[in-house]
Design a protein with these regions (language model features):
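An alpha-helical support segment within catalytic cores of ATP-dependent transferases
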Residues: 1-26, 149-150
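All-alpha amphipathic helical-bundle segments outside canonical DNA-binding/catalytic cores
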Residues: 87-97
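Canonical protein kinase catalytic loop motif
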Residues: 24, 29-30, 34
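Conserved protein kinase catalytic/activation segment
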Residues: 32-42
Length: 153
């Protein structure tokens, strides 16, 4: 585990060091957007932080690469009506996804003594969980070599 995480962090750190940070939601996914009368309402602000705007936007993307590219185009077209978007930060999507995967496991580990956590994450302390987690990190290492999504806005 330490070997793969060290490899990932060595690859990711230089990319993040030059990235401008702004206030972001920090956990902006479809489950944290409630819709009423065709108006989105964002909830769950306990993870607000400073980060690159793409951190909030990539979590709204799903599906295969073509689907994500199309969704990204729609999101960035709308986003740029209010604020300029630095397309060079598209290269951060997979590094940020990797950090989120690592952070999620660390978050569970930090809270493991809370009686609710073993109930909510019953496989966390199993070999299977950690085998799958390491496999996901290895897949992310390969994804870091893939070209980023493109935006033609």
């Amino acid at each position: 585990y330490s070997s793969i995480t060290e490899q990932l962090l060595e690859r990711i750190a230089p990319l993040m060091s030059e990235t401008p940070m702004v206030p972001i939601h920090g956990d902006c996914h479809m489950g944290n957007i409630l819709w009423r009368d065709d108006i989105p309402h964002f909830v769950d602000f306990d993870d607000c932080m400073s980060g690159p705007p793409i951190q909030d936007l990539w979590m709204l993307l799903s599906g295969e690469r073509a689907d994500r590219t199309f969704q990204l185009s729609l999101i960035l077209d709308a986003y740029q009506e209010f604020y300029d978007f630095d397309t060079s930060t598209l290269q951060l999507i997979e590094p940020l996804r990797t950090l989120r995967i690592m952070y999620h496991a660390a978050w569970i580990a930090r809270r493991w003594q809370d009686p609710a956590f073993p109930l909510a994450f019953p496989t966390f302390d199993t070999v299977n969980y950690w085998s799958n987690h390491v496999l996901a990190l290895r897949e992310q290492l390969a994804m870091l070599d893939e070209p980023p999504l493109t935006y033609f806005g």
